[in-house]
């Protein structure tokens, strides 16, 4: 078993994977009604939860990572924050500007669908983030283009000191790792 966070496992069938993981029309239509309220939204994912108690394996990312990633976009871009700790996100000074909206998603399917409909991504060191961004690259659900040409910003620090995993194949070549 594994997280399969390397497109080298399935690059030869990427279109099929994206098609198979397409969202049900009901969820997709609900998410489209939300996403049209934003102009070129950036998906920003923050994973805390179990990472706070398991930081030796998966450390939560600091606000400095998100600040640096945000600086790679125009300062007026709208950002939708997805997190398992929305209360904490709302308390952070970095996200207090009106351009930030915290998703109060009813479930992970809706959050993943909304993420995949965004124009650009700032991902956490999380399989949920990774898949949300990867599925959007060539999303098969119209009316998205057949090729995703947005930015994906990913953290260089993916694992903690207890896990000495090689991450060279973790990120697609067009993702920006900081």
Residue ranges and their predicted role:
Residues 1-72:
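Secretory-pathway luminal glycosyltransferase catalytic domains
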Residues 7-8, 90-91, 162-165:
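Short, solvent-exposed polar/charged micro-motifs at secondary-structure junctions
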Residues 12, 20, 26, 51, ...:
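Short linear motifs in intrinsically disordered/low-complexity regions
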Residues 15, 78-79, 100, 174-176:
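Residue-level marker of intrinsically disordered, low-complexity segments enriched
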Residues 38, 142, 152, 169-170:
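Compositionally biased, intrinsically disordered/low-complexity regions enriched for serine, proline
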Residues 43, 99-100, 152, 175-177:
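Conserved beta-strand scaffold positions in the cores of enzyme catalytic domains, especially
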Residues 73-160:
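Donor-binding and catalytic core of enzymes assembling or modifying cell-surface/extracellular glycoconjugates
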Residues 158-178:
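Leloir-type glycosyltransferase catalytic cores
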């Amino acid at each position: 078993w594994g997280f399969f966070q390397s497109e080298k496992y399935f690059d030869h069938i990427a279109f099929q994977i994206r098609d198979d993981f397409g969202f049900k029309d009901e969820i997709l239509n609900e998410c489209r009604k939300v996403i049209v309220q934003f102009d070129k939204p950036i998906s920003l994912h923050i994973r805390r939860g179990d990472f706070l108690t398991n930081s030796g394996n998966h450390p939560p990312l600091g606000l400095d990572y998100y600040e640096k990633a945000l600086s790679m976009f125009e300062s007026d871009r709208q950002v939708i924050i997805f997190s398992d700790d929305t209360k904490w996100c709302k308390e952070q000074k970095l996200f207090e500007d009106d351009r930030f909206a915290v998703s109060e998603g009813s479930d992970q399917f809706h959050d993943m669908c909304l993420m995949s409909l965004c124009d650009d991504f700032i991902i956490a060191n999380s399989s949920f983030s990774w898949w949300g961004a990867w599925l959007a690259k060539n999303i098969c659900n119209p009316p998205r283009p057949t090729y995703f040409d947005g930015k994906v910003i990913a953290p260089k620090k993916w694992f903690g000191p207890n896990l000495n995993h090689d991450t060279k194949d973790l990120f697609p070549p067009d993702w920006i790792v900081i």
